[in-house]
């Protein structure tokens, strides 16, 4: 994967997250902001999830209250380089915990 392909894939990921949060109809207030390639999700209780891209490594990084995760693209899924879990699984687990209700991005 070259840098432009990586950025295209990361942009698609960011757009999907933003669209899902725009459609969010849960009880919690969840905000999403993109600034300089960093996507910040802020929850009603003040907690945050930070997602950023690491261009030199062609990785997506996810920072949550539970910890930090690094994802490599394998096939068509972003996979955690430590646990083997998918990006969407870990994001949904963290968002659900931080929102206090079920949050789905798929």
Curated annotation (Swiss-Prot):
Keyword tRNA processing: no
Family: Belongs to the frataxin family.
Entry-linked PROSITE patterns: FRATAXIN_1, FRATAXIN_2
GO MF annotation list: ferric iron binding; ferrous iron binding
Pfam families, A to Z: Frataxin_Cyay (PF01491)
Alphabetical UniProt keywords: Iron, Metal-binding
Biological role stated in the UniProt entry: Involved in iron-sulfur (Fe-S) cluster assembly. May act as a regulator of Fe-S biogenesis.
Species of provenance: Escherichia fergusonii (strain ATCC 35469 / DSM 13698 / CCUG 18766 / IAM 14443 / JCM 21226 / LMG 7866 / NBRC 102419 / NCTC 12128 / CDC 0568-73)
Protein name per the record: Iron-sulfur cluster assembly protein CyaY
Membrane-spanning intervals of the chain: none
Database matches in SUPFAM superfamilies: Frataxin/Nqo15-like
Gene Ontology CC entries for this record: cytosol
Entry superkingdom: Bacteria
UniProt entry tagged with the keyword Iron: yes
GO biological process: iron-sulfur cluster assembly
């Amino acid at each position: 994967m070259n840098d432009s392909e990586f950025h295209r894939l990361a942009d698609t990921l960011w757009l999907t997250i933003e669209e899902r949060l725009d459609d969010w109809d849960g009880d919690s207030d969840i905000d999403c902001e993109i600034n300089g390639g960093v996507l910040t999700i802020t929850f009603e209780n003040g907690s945050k999830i930070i997602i950023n891209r690491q261009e030199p490594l062609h990785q997506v990084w996810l920072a949550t209250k539970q910890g930090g995760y690094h994802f490599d693209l394998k096939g068509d899924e972003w996979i955690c380089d430590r646990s083997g879990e998918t990006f969407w699984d870990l994001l949904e687990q963290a968002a659900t915990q931080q929102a206090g209700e079920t949050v789905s991005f798929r």
